[in-house]
Amino acid sequence: MGRRKKMVERVTTLMNEPEKIRNIGIVAHIDHGKTTLSDNLLAGAGMISKELAGRQLFMDSDEEEQERGITIDASNVSMVHTYNNEDYLINLIDTPGHVDFGGDVTRAMRAVDGAVVVVDAVEGTMPQTETVLRQALREHVRPVLFVNKVDRLINELQVDSQEMQVRLGKVIDHVNKLIKNMNPEKFKAGWKVDAAAGTVAFGSALYNWAISVPMMQKTGISFTNVYDYCKAEDMKALAEKCPLHATVLDMVIRFLPNPLEAQKGRVPTIWHGDANSEIGKSMASANADGDLAFMVTDISIDPHAGEVATGRLFSGSFSRGMEVYISGTARKSRVQQVGIFMGPERLEVEKIPAGNIAAVTGLKDAIVGSTVTTLDGMTPFESIRHVSEPVVTVAVEAKHTKDLPKLVEVLRQVAKEDPTLQITLDEETGEHLMAGMGELHLEVIAHRIQRDKNVEITTSKPIVVYRETIKKKIEPVEGKSPNRHNRFYIYVEPLDTAIVEMIKSGDISMNLPELERRQKLIELGMGKEEAKGIVGIHNSNIFIDITKGIQYLNETMELILDGFEEVMRAGPLTREPVANMKCVLVDAKLHEDAIHRGPAQVIPAARQAIQAGMLMAEDCLLEPYQKVFVQVPQLTMGGATKELQGRRGIILNMTTEGDLAIIEARVPVAEMFGFAGEIRSATEGRAMWSTEFGGFDIVPTSIQTEVVGQIRERKGLKRDLPKASDYLSM
C-alpha cells in the first residue's frame, strides 16, 4: 500500500503544474496491442508488477474484457514518469479497437491532447487505425506512432534486417499519407510522424522493449542489434537495455503538448463561444483560478457512490461541495467527491485544477457531452460526434414481470453510460428496443445488464435498423386538421448530400448563430430564402418555412414542428426513422381562435401532409452497410470473395502483399449475420477480418417490397403498402 500512497502524493503534487501534465490516449485497430502497451507503461511507472505486465491486462479490468480478450470501455489511469530528472504526470486513456465500441474512442479523444497510435508491424495500418486517426485529428489531438510486434516480423516472417527497415518505413509512410489526406493544414504545420525526429518508436509490447532514434543515441543500440537480439530470442536483455515504458513515455513527454500548449489550439475546435470572453480566455490558458468549464466524456456507475462523471477540466478547479450548472438543466448540482482514476480504482483528492482529467460524483443530471460550469449561461461545448450510427436492434424484456420497473431504470442507466446505445419504447408493442453498433456491442450490454444490474432478461434476435427516404420532389400537399379549420401546404424533396454531411458532422445545427448557419447553407448551394427559413433540424432532415405574413403562424410553429418530428421518427412506409429529407411549408390557413388550432388539430394536419407527400415522392428504404476488410492467403481468396458476393457484397478493392490477399468489400448489415463462422469455413479458418460502418444505401428494388412487408408485419402493421390517399382522406 505504501507504494500506491506515495504514487498518489506525487500525482496530486504534479496536478498543479500544467506544464508537467500530458493527457494522452492510446488508439489502434483491434488486437494491435494497445492494452498490452498500456500495462507495460503502468509497470514501468510502478503501478503493477513487471512480471504481470502484458499478461495482467490491468486496463481491461472488466470480466467480459478479460474473457473476450478485447477492450470494451475506455479505461483511465494517472501515473508519474521521470524524464531528464523531472517528474511528469501522465493521464492515460486506453481505448477499444473493435468497431462496435468506437463510441468510447470518440469520447476519449475529447478528454486528451495527444494520442499514441499503435500499429502492428506485420498487419500495417488497418481500417480502425484510419478511423481513430481521423477522430484524433478532428478533435485537434496530436499523434505519435508506436509500431508494435516488430519481433513477429523477424521471427515469424523471417525478414532480414534490411527488409525489416523497409517494412517499418512503409508503415510510417502510410500513417503520414493518412494524416496528409485527412488534414493537409496540420500535416504542413508539422503534425507528421518522423522516426529521425523521434516521434516514432518501434518495439514489442508483449516482450516489453522499444527503440526510437533518441533512445538509440542514448543507449548505442542500433536496428542491427535489435534484429540480432530478436533472432537470438533474447528479448529480456533487450528489454533491460531499452525498456518500453522509458522509450514511449519519453516520446510522449517530449513531443505531445501539455494542457497550456494544447488548449490554445483545441478550445476553438471544440467550443464555439466568444474567444475574447473571460471564460474563453480562461480555457485557452488552462487557468485554474477562472470559472469552472468541464466536459463530461464518460459516465460510469459506482455501486457505493452512484454515478461518476469523468471528463476534461478546461478551466477552473473542482473541489468538494461546490455548486455547478449542467448544460440543458435548470437546477444547480452540488459536487460530492472529486477524484482521479487508477485503472478500476477511483481515488479521492481534495481539489483538481484545470488541465486534468477528473472523476466527479454528485452530477446526477449530467450525461456524456454535458458542459459543467460555475458560469450561468455559458455557451456549451460542441456535442461529441460519433463516427458510426446504430445499425442493429434487439428487443429486451424482463424474464420476470416483477423486474419490469427495475429493467426500465437499468436501461436508463446503460443509455447514460453509453451514448452510442439508443433505447426506445415501442408504444404499440410495449417492448424496449436497444439499438447499437453491432451484434457484439448488444451482446456485451445484455450480458452486463444481467451480471452487474442483476436483472434477468430475454433478448430477441438482432434486427437491422433501416431508414426511410424519398427519391424525388413533389408539388405541395394539403394537410387538413380534423376540424377542417386549419390547412397546411407542404412539399418534400431529397436533401442535398453536402448539406446532409454537414448536419451529421455537427457543422450545421440549430445551435449555430442564424447568420452563420444561413451563410454555410448558401455556400452549399441552398437558395437565400430557404436558408433564411430553416425552423427545425431533426437528424438529417430539415423543415423550412417560406410563407409570408401568415397570421398566428409563429405561435403555431412549435406544433407544426412536433408533427414534422413525429414523422421523422417513424416514416409512413415502415415506421422507421426518416433520413436526408427537406420539408418546405409554402402556405397555411389558420383559424383565428386559438382554441380551434391546438395540438389535436395542428399536429395531425402537418403530420398527414408530410406522410402523404413522402409516399408521393417515392418513399423507399435505406439499409446500413459495413465495409469489410478480409486478409487471406491467396490460395483461399476465391472462397472469401465468393462468400462476400453471396451476401450481396460488392468487392471494392483487392491487393496482394507477399502471399496474402487483402479484399475490401461493402456488404449490407442484413447479410452479415453468421459471417464469422462462414468466412472461417470458406477459407479453412485462415481469414482475418474486420469491419467498419459503411453508411446507408437504397435497398435494391428487387427485394424492397419483401423487406418492407416483413418490417410492417413485425411491427403489427398491415403487410400491404400504404398509399398517399390513406393519409389525405383522414
Swiss-Prot record:
- A GO cellular-component term linked to this record: cytosol
Task: Enumerate the GO terms in the molecular function aspect.
Answer: GTP binding; GTPase activity; translation elongation factor activity
Q: Which InterPro entries match?
A: EFG_II, EFG_III/V, EFG_V-like, EFTu-like_2, G_TR_CS, P-loop_NTPase, Ribosomal_Su5_D2-typ_SF, Ribsml_uS5_D2-typ_fold_subgr
Q: Which residues form the tr-type G domain?
A: 19-260
Supply the CDD domains for this chain: aeEF2_snRNP_like_IV, EF2_II, EF2_snRNP_III, Elongation_Factor_C
List residues, modification Diphthamide. H596
What is this protein's name? Answer: Elongation factor 2
Intracellular or extracellular location(s): Cytoplasm
Q: List keywords of the entry alphabetically.
A: Cytoplasm, Elongation factor, GTP-binding, Nucleotide-binding, Protein biosynthesis
PANTHER family with a match to the protein in the record: ELONGATION FACTOR-LIKE GTPASE 1, TRANSLATION ELONGATION FACTOR-RELATED
Instruction: Report the family membership.
Output: Belongs to the TRAFAC class translation factor GTPase superfamily. Classic translation factor GTPase family. EF-G/EF-2 subfamily.
Its function, per the record, reads:
Catalyzes the GTP-dependent ribosomal translocation step during translation elongation. During this step, the ribosome changes from the pre-translocational (PRE) to the post-translocational (POST) state as the newly formed A-site-bound peptidyl-tRNA and P-site-bound deacylated tRNA move to the P and E sites, respectively. Catalyzes the coordinated movement of the two tRNA molecules, the mRNA and conformational changes in the ribosome.
Record's signal peptide: none
Name the positions where GTP binds.
28-35, 94-98, 148-151
